[in-house]
């Protein structure tokens, strides 16, 4: 029996190590999310190892910068391991709360990490994937990048600090992205201030090689920026599609309630904007009404909160959301059974002020 347990432990530890590759290349620390078959989604062990690695490298005088990237070309990170969360919640375990708490602690720590932290956002960057990049000093997108906070589609709300980073997008772009969960590409990510640099994907290996060759005397944010520029990188967005709808987004998503936003979209008469309004309304109609409200409110509140206050608000809301929200049903309908027919708990007209205060007292 003891031998069997030992072998099982070895297999488990090997899997942990395989899921996350940690390397030192000269003065560069390199973290690779290594679950390409699962779009590099995060589990609790990976979160713990990333956090521990960063803490060690913070104290390591031979490490001058850190890069985090995903294995493969399809995804940087598709967020948290949804099926594991569903299993924990369904069975009355507490693993999901451990996951959320430690994930949020890691995300907040990244904002305060004292050395250059470089996130290569190549491929899909979804949900929790956004959490481990938005605090980076260099958020690098490529032509393959697809960014989204899709939580409202699965009966949840944008977390991992979204109340902070979405509320700081220009105008009300963050509210639009958080409520609808639409996917944006590289140019829109730059425009929305959710990325800092564009670099062609075929230059990424050269960028990593260049970073690995830097010496202690030449390492710094200025040198990293120069290297990106030399490889064809740029900070300015070129023809972002969001800019074409910016005035419309700001006028509609600055409204204080989901009901008012939906009504404004429904009443759109301008022929140039009517299709966009119809498409946006159609997206919202498929998502959890409570999630739409939660997304709009947390991003609204986040405008007036510090980073620490945003994370504190979100973790309190998570604990309540597990009890009253639509997360289990959303995961069932979209990911497990894939019938795409979630039965949400509430209609938007049922979510009166008094009902919301009873359901989500921490944000209403």
Protein language model regions, located:
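Conserved CoA-thioester-binding segment of acyl-CoA-metabolizing enzymes
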Residues: 14-69, 94, 108-109, 362
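Hydrophobic/aromatic residues within transmembrane alpha-helices
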Residues: 68, 81, 132-133, 188-189, ...
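Glycine- (often His-adjacent) and acidic-residue-rich active-site loop
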Residues: 70-105, 155, 348
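Contiguous mid-protein beta-loop-alpha structural module that forms a pocket-lining wall or clamp
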Residues: 161-164, 168-219
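Amphipathic alpha-helical blocks and their helix-capping loop/short-beta junctions
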Residues: 200-283
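Long, low-complexity C-terminal extensions of enzymes
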Residues: 265-272, 276, 284-364
